[in-house]
Amino acid sequence: MNTRVQPGGDGSAHTPAPSDDALDTNPSGVTASEPGRNGMRISRPGGRPARRPRSAPHPLRAEWLRGFAPWAGAGLLLALAWAMAAKADQWQGSWGATTELLSTAAALIGVPFALAAGSWQGGRERRRRTAELLSSTARTPLVQLLVAALPLACWLAAAHVLVVAGALAACAPYASAGGPAYTVFAGNALTLAACAVLGHTVGRAVPFRLTALPLAVGGYVVGGVIGTGRSDVRYLTFCMIHILGDNGLAVWWYPLVSALWAAGLAAAAVLALTAYRRATALLPLAAALGAAVLLVQTGDGLVRDNPLSHRQVCDTSTTPDICVNATYPGMLPEVTRALSGLTGRLEGVRNLPVRYEDLWRDPHRGEAQLPILTPIGWSAVRGKVTDPRQYAWEAAQMLVRWDCHEAPSTERIAVTDEAVLRWLAPDPLSARIREYFMKQARQEGDTKDLARLRAEDEAYERLTAMPDGERRSWLGRYFATADECSPKPSEVPSL
């Protein structure tokens, strides 16, 4: 047995030394493998297998999930959603109006927001004082810029896509013809992403806190001034697709070429700032300029007429027939219901217009203009006529000298016209206006106006008191001259 002398002792006291078995820390005989030469694994006595060190998360993951980019996406989402919700009455029920307002919101809100957000993100290295640290890493300046800029660009594009999806879902229950313009929304999303990258590049080149503000203001001013102009240069405005409701459709490649114009500028700026060979920036710049030339040269040809806007759907069971534009055929039952009182009173009357028409032209002879239903948000909201009595009154006005700029030549004809209109479409608002004028004329002692108003009341009472057959016959003679601006007094029947 081995013995060990304890220090400080006299050497006579012995302590047994631990045996080999006692030194064994792995009595079960289990061994762990460790890598050896030539890929061979050797056993390591005792202990657990060595854990591999956890790899650091990819920088893109951190940019995607934390920091400024998600908050910027949420901010743009709220801004665009608020803009659409505030004017929901003006686009729900019309694919064209929905597309137009989404494009306008993207141009006037999304583009300035993306430029400012990108600029703020691009200047963060200067604010954090980490520019020198980043320059010492193995990644190239181009990779560093893209890693920081692309997550923000994708978040902003995703915010726009979510707002578009919500708007289309809100429009679909009330729209009855046409469909969404998906290339417009795809082009606008790409343009917003390009604006974020362009703003990021400017923020890196001019890394000051106030750089974002001039970019946002400049984006808004350019979009508002140039985009609403009359020259063909307006087609260069980012995201602003120039259509007018349901009457025009953007050609399918227009939004994509517009996105190429923005993306080319962004790519040229990125390469000019970060590439080792700055001349490579000329390639995307040439693509951007080519897209710009194509947009300006094509001009109004970028928008074509909607074939549906030249057609009508009609209800031939009424007198006159009622036709609405084929871009919103679902409004026909609602319009027919709103005009049911008017058409019921005209049943059996001769010399009426054949139909109410709803095309973008002056009515032909034998037609009357249907009161306008567009733009959405005035006479019609979400597939309903907002004020049926007012709408019927407007439709009655279209039957009696609607295109005449001067009053009839004699007062008797004017009195007769007023009596007929009051009988065809009684309107509480018109009645209140008449009472106001009557009261004012009495207070001012205006005998001429009092006499005219009393004559109109008497004519209306005589027309109302007529038997139905006699009234239909009288109205037939009256409507024989109702479209003439200066009929002979002898041709207009009196009351």
Q: What is the meaning of each model-derived region?
A:
Residues L249-L260, A272-G290:
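Amide-forming acyltransferase catalytic core, primarily the GNAT-like/NAT-type
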Residues A117-C154:
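Helix-loop-helix units of permease transmembrane domains in multi-pass membrane transporters
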Residues M1-G118, E125, A268-P284, L294-R304, ...:
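Hydrophobic alpha-helical transmembrane segments
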Residues L134-S135, R139, V143, G203-F208, ...:
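Membrane-interface helix-boundary motifs at transmembrane edges
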Residues R54-A56, R61-A97, Q144-A268:
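Hydrophobic alpha-helical segments
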